[in-house]
Amino acid sequence: MNLSNRFAYKANVSQFIKSSDEEVLGDLTDQYRHRQLEQQQINAWRYQIKELKRVLINFPDATLLLEFEIPRIGKRVDAILIHNGSILVLEYKVGAKSYDASSIDQACDYALDLKNFHKASHHLNIVPILIATDAPNKNSIVELGLDGIAKPILANSENLLNVLNLVSNSLPKSTTDTDLWVNSTYHPTPTIVEAAQALYKGHKVEEISRSDAGAINLTKTCSHVSKIIDDAKANKKKAICLITGAPGAGKSLAGLNIATERMRYLENEHAVFLSGNGPLVDVLREALVLDQLAENEFLPKDQKVKRKVAEQKASAFIQNIHHFRDDNLASSEPPVEKVVIFDEAQRAWNKDQASSFMKRKRGQDDFAMSEPDFLLSVMNRHQDWCVVVCLIGGGQEINTGEAGITEWITALKENYKNWDIHFSNEIFKSDYALSQEWLEDQGALNLYPENDLHLAVSLRSFRAEKLSDFIGALIAGEGSKAKEIKQHLTNYPIYVTRDLDKAKNTLKNLARGSERIGLVASSNAIRLKPEGIYVKGQIDPTQWFLKAKSDIRSSYYLEDVATEFDVQGLEIDWVGVCWDANFRVEDGKWNAYNFSGSKWQSVHDLEKRKYIANSYRVLLTRGRQGVVIFVPKGDNSDLTRQQVFYDGIFDYLKSCGIQEV
């Protein structure tokens, strides 16, 4: 997408100064004609227009944009000044008597977003300036980072002109084609939380996703699924779509988009996004609720949304798969949803796990179905049509009893042969544990291989598409291969240290603006406790992922550690991975251990070994921008924390090309 329609006002500064205040104000208010505008906002704009006319008198050739939208963040920058080849981001706080931390972060966030996702800004210097109009003077200095983003500069009404002159004189001068800059493409890679918020508000998936040649276009996959849904509806058919993809390739984003598209399509065509990942569901729902409540600021009193109403609406869009199952267990009626999207469908329980759970937890002694079989039976209650969309990740199973994709095919073969099965041939790769020969042996099924149902490139880290390959080689014990791949991760920092305080300080120094940092560890990393890392303490993922820097429950405080079960499917900017002796290098290869009672026990069962390895794969792929790994030094006076346990891990990680802090 381009940003040409993403601002309320654009003009050369000399033209802006000649325009009447009311003319400029008219353009600003027109952008918000569908919303209730508070008088306070209109007054703030009047003030900004007068102030900008006063201070920009020395910059007649610069270009000014007002109310410039940053789609990924869902907010608008008060003003952008394009001058001498640099971008000045101006954020006003009219009437503010101090420079509060959240406002400083906000200005920095705008600069970071432009630098990372707006193509024409990649190689330009960007200076965020926070203008707290009534705050005291602060010493100003232009400090550019290696990527060309300056540390936020603090200004007030009195010294803004001096600050602008300082910035102008401090930066190298060049020329920028303003029209090219404005029309340049914007390719964000939002977090799953940001994506859900944007789609929920009605943004299109192409507005919030990359569309460059390096990534398969998500719109292609979503459009293909939409055609399958239309065909099923028109021809009274039942179909299942199996969408595969690399970790972070955008499967959940595709699923959320399909859910929102079909929710809006017709009132009698309900769609729901289902996940068995409790923390993911809780975090996404709470994020949507908070977003809706934040909108209240712009609504008249009689239109403000109450929390309970916002929660009900969010719950209809995103549901826990186990709640969906229980609701439909109590009824034999078809569900209201005609389209259901199952996130991480390979995690659905096999017959033994599902039956055991239903007997123990639900008192259902006669339940004898796998989870895929039961969920398909629920959707099969529809007399006319329905579509099931399965989002399938490869090589990520971390729980006992997760059946993989074969359980879905088996259920279709045994009970629902009339269903159409749409999939990509990528599903036969080893990561998905489904062989073409096995599928062909299942007899007559309505199979439709379609390439558009595979998402090939990881979008999770906008800095490092090769990250999943690197982590895969590292976890597989292929150190030399990992080291070779690491050479291509030049813009994705990965560090290792034996000092936890150093790890924490590194995370704090790497993060800018409101970039989120946090500590994670394996759920069986029991012997990190002497380091102050206690994995058995329950965290609230909604607080950990969503609370602000000032809240001790947030990940920012680096006090509460999240495990693979808390963070699966979610991500933060900079992650600190705390490594314990449950996955250690011995005689040149990885060995898995489980802590039981008061000692480590070697894990021989191949499935359980795989779960432990994959827990570290999950942890190491949670950082959008970089990773800091902490490996304890150990203590030879403690049999459970022998130094040799940890030295092998540390040495191996360094041999993979990971730099020590």
Regions found by a protein language model. Give the residues of each.
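Accessory nucleic-acid engagement/destabilization modules that flank
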Residues: 1-189
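N-terminal pre-P-loop "Q-motif" helix
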Residues: 209-239
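Hydrophobic anchor at the beta1->P-loop junction of P-loop NTPases
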Residues: 243
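Conserved helicase/translocase motor-coupling segment
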Residues: 255, 399-402, 423, 428-581, ...
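Conserved Walker A/P-loop ATP-binding site and its immediately adjacent core
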Residues: 270-289
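Conserved RecA-like ASCE ATPase "motif II neighborhood" in helicase/translocase motors
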Residues: 307-379, 559-563
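C-terminal accessory regions
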Residues: 387, 557-661
